[in-house]
A protein has these predicted regions:
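Structural helix-adjacent loops and short alpha-helical linkers that scaffold large soluble proteins
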Residues: 84, 247-251, 344-359, 405-413, ...
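Beta-lactamase-like hydrolase cores
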Residues: 168-208
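Short, charged, amphipathic alpha-helices and their helix-cap/turn boundaries
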Residues: 183-185, 189-191, 210-215, 249, ...
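Active-site SXXK
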Residues: 209, 226-252, 276, 339-343, ...
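Active-site-proximal alpha-helical segments within enzyme catalytic domains
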Residues: 237, 279, 335-344, 385-407, ...
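Active-site helix/loop module of the DD-peptidase/beta-lactamase fold
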Residues: 246-284, 288, 318-322, 348-385, ...
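Active-site Gly/Thr loop motif
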Residues: 368-375, 419-474
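Structured C-terminal helix/loop/strand segments within mature extracytoplasmic catalytic/sensor domains
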Residues: 457-506
Length: 506
């Protein structure tokens, strides 16, 4: 059975068992704006394109997909705690497409050595190894170890069960606030799990910083770290915001990537940190959300930055410019990878341990105990999408933004940073797509039945953390990747019901 928790004002008040699945309420949803013409986007980008070469990633795509499959199963088993056969059927299609899995050997899980091996028929075997607090890492072909020293990152926080929300998981029993329609909230939770094919694993609603509802699929708890994919880009933005608040960088300064300083007149040296956060660097790679993407062509760099088993920072830094910075917005993993590069440079330049930085500077301060950031074999965070966390931890991060970057009286993010990440990037607006800010998506086209100033973290497979300032709401939905096709609609249905359940701010 799925447990449902409903409450108001302070966390959870009433704990009850969910009823047998019923048909959830299906509200009428407003129509979003029509999408821009791909042809017009392509034409505009072609007119601005620079004459630079494109060199695809090296290696056999099937070998890269085997690496992705091994890593996905490794993380599912050793981080989330899933059964390997369930994981092979249900999770992580992004770097290991379901249709490709039949072409590969069945994952071999070595629990003693905490490794997963996937063989390419007639070829190499790719291996992912669990490294504790660095999660699972794909080993380079021919290597049996990583090129960095893994660290145990123990939280300094007390046991979560002894601390009240949000710094802990202890939930106080208080009656619902009279202005909330808790029957509608219950309907919204039902809608988030309907249909079962959506594979929703966790759904959580926080109002004014306090939990008012949550439910988990069988085998999943409030402390289970789940696949979150590109919601990690928003973690990356937050870590950069912390560094800016600490004085390490300025938002609009040129990004001091070492590879761009080696030659005079390297136009990449004009890429600003804000351009990276805006997904508007102009760097040339192949990515699946490009309007002219051909999935039958060469293996996309966007995936290779996960599966290549190389120094991801150096690979991203050595891509040429396709457009001048800030002119064309494209959803490409180079930009968050390079932002993580800048994070490492700043942390190590002041003599601190890079792998410790997220926990000390962010996670422990917010009460986030479950977040795992995975790395490449060189110890570089792949926080463009290789991270795992519980729904409650994603809600904590969302509430930091709802509170304008202030937590327990401390300004953790610069004043105006939350507005920056939630304001449409100019290069995206130029394509009539007011949907992307600073490593956060924006409801600027009305795709979701919430106000258009709502903004959200989003990951492949239907992962969402929606921040709705007009209603003081943070809504988290996590699920298994196989349900991606149904997940978005069920999430929209849940949001529409929440808009009926929760009054707007006065």
């Amino acid at each position: 059975m799925q447990a449902i928790v409903i409450a108001a004002l302070v966390s959870v008040g009433v704990i009850a068992q969910a009823q047998q699945p019923t048909t959830a309420a299906r509200p009428t949803l407003p129509a979003p704006d029509p999408p821009p013409s791909p042809a017009a986007m392509i034409a505009r980008s072609k007119a601005l394109e620079l004459n630079t070469p494109y060199v695809p990633p090296p290696g056999d795509p099937l070998v890269h997909q085997a690496a992705g499959f091994a890593k996905v199963i490794c993380s599912a088993v050793f981080i989330t705690g899933l059964d390997p056969d369930f994981a092979a059927e249900n999770v992580g299609y992004f770097t290991a497409p379901y249709e490709i899995r039949a072409k590969l050997g069945k994952p071999v899980v070595d629990r003693e050595h905490k490794q997963v091996h996937v063989a390419v028929p007639g070829g190499v075997t790719r291996t992912a190894v669990f490294l504790g607090d660095q999660g699972c890492v794909t080993l380079p072909v021919g290597k049996d170890s990583v090129s960095f020293k893994p660290l145990e990152l123990k939280s300094t926080l007390p046991d979560a069960s002894t601390q009240t929300w949000p710094m802990g998981d202890l939930l106080r029993n208080e009656p619902p606030a009279p202005e909330l329609n808790m029957a509608k909230v219950k309907q919204a939770v039902d809608a988030a799990f309907d249909p079962p094919e959506a594979k929703t694993a966790a759904f959580l609603v926080a109002w004014r910083g306090r939990l008012i509802a949550e439910r988990y699929a069988p085998g999943i708890t409030a402390q289970t770290p789940l696949e979150s994919w590109s919601m990690g880009k928003s973690v990356t933005a937050t870590l950069m915001g912390v560094l800016i608040q600490q004085g390490a960088y300025e938002l609009w300064q040129p990004a001091p990537i070492p590879e761009w300083q080696e030659e005079t007149n390297d136009l990449r040296s004009e890429i600003r940190i804000a351009d990276l956060l805006h997904m508007s660097s102009g760097l040339r790679i192949k990515a699946p959300e490009d309007p002219d993407y051909d999935p039958t062509g060469t293996y996309a760099d966007h995936f290779y930055l996960y599966t290549g088993g190389m120094n991801s920072f150096h690979y991203a830094a050595t891509r040429p410019l396709q457009w001048f910075p800030g002119k064309v917005g494209r959803y490409r993993n180079t930009d968050p990878v390079l932002t993580n590069y800048l994070i490492r440079l700043a942390v190590e330049n002041r003599g601190e341990e890079y792998l410790w930085f997220p926990r000390r500077a962010l996670f422990d301060k917010l009460g986030m105990r479950t977040m795992v950031l995975e790395t490449d074999p060189f110890g570089n965070f792949l926080a463009q999408g290789y991270e795992f966390a519980s729904a409650r931890d994603w809600a904590r991060l969302g509430n930091l933004y709802l509170q304008d970057g202030i937590w327990n009286g401390e300004r953790m993010l610069p004043e105006g940073f939350a507005k920056f990440v939630s304001t449409p990037a100019p290069a995206w607006v130029a394509d009539h797509r007011p949907i992307y800010g600073g490593f956060f998506w924006i409801n600027g086209d009305g795709e979701y039945p919430v106000p258009r100033n709502a903004y959200f973290m989003s990951g492949a497979g239907g992962q969402k953390t929606m921040i709705i300032p007009s209603h003081d709401l943070v809504v988290v939905r996590l699920g298994h990747f196989k349900g991606a096709n149904e997940a978005n609609q069920s999430f929209k249905n849940a949001l529409a019901l929440l808009m009926e359940a929760v009054p707007p701010n006065k």
